[in-house]
């Protein structure tokens, strides 16, 4: 019995929900707003649910860009995998949909802060990002056991170019994970947003060089739609 209790304690203490137990609280109001939309909006069971960060939330032309699909937007600005783990069930379980698409791009940003006169890196490691991706997947599978789940690659941007190597490695880890698991798919985008000079193409972004402009979204939609067409039977 003691051994069993120890195993249970060890499992709970190692859970991402415990490790990042404080990260979700600041987003509670945003999640409640999204839940309110679930009560007001109606969709068919052929819809595709999009969850993630501001690139989802700000995608005003999503219905036009994904014309043959029925998108549901449930993104909130600044989302990280370390906070979306707290809300995955609430964002996903109410929806009977054809597929789920995820774009979360804020766990590796290059931001630092000073603590006791020392500079501290606030980013997660690529391997930690992968752990959270796996956790999110398990949460989704509790209510949607076999549904296709698409992970959209984090886009290369000038704003975060200094940490692109880390972002790229995290992308590679997630892609490799999807290839080994049934009904998980990875949407590669990086090559479309890199210019001939090997740098991010700023013509596809707004002034902050982080978020997509209309042209960037149109391209994003084309890439995503092609992946849906390939992997989802209409």
Regions from the language model: what does each represent?
Residues 1-50, 64, 231-234:
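N-terminal secretory targeting modules
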Residues 46-61, 79:
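Catalytic nucleophile-elbow at a beta strand-turn-alpha helix junction centered on a G-D-S/GDSL motif
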Residues 48-51, 72-75, 99-104, 148-153, ...:
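Structural recognition of the beta-strand scaffold that forms the well-ordered cores
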Residues 56-65, 70, 83-130, 155-158:
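Oxyanion-hole/transition-state-stabilizing segment in secreted/luminal serine hydrolases
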Residues 73-77, 120-126, 159-164, 206-210:
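Second-shell loop/turn segments in exported
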Residues 88, 133-138, 171:
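Generic structural signal for well-ordered alpha-helices
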């Amino acid at each position: 019995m003691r051994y069993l209790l120890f195993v249970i304690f060890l499992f709970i203490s190692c859970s991402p929900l415990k490790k990042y137990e404080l990260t979700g609280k600041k987003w509670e109001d945003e999640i409640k707003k999204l839940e309110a939309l679930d009560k007001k909006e109606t969709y068919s069971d052929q819809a595709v649910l999009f969850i993630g960060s501001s690139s989802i939330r700000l995608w005003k032309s999503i219905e036009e860009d994904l014309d043959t699909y029925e998108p549901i937007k449930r993104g909130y600005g600044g989302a990280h995998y370390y906070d979306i783990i707290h809300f995955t069930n609430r964002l996903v379980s109410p929806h009977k949909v054809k597929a789920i698409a995820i774009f979360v791009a804020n766990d590796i940003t290059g931001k630092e802060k000073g603590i006791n006169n020392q500079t501290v890196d606030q980013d997660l490691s690529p391997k930690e990002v992968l752990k959270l991706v796996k956790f999110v997947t398990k949460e989704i599978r509790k209510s949607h056991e076999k549904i296709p789940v698409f992970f959209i690659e984090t886009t290369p941007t000038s704003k975060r170019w200094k940490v692109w190597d880390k972002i790229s490695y995290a992308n590679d880890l997630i892609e490799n994970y999807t290839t080994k698991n049934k009904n998980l798919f990875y949407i590669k985008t990086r090559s479309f947003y890199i210019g001939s000079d090997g740098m991010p193409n700023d013509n596809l972004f707004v002034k902050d060089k982080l978020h997509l402009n209309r042209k960037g979204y149109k391209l994003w939609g084309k890439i995503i739609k092609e992946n849906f067409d390939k992997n989802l039977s209409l």
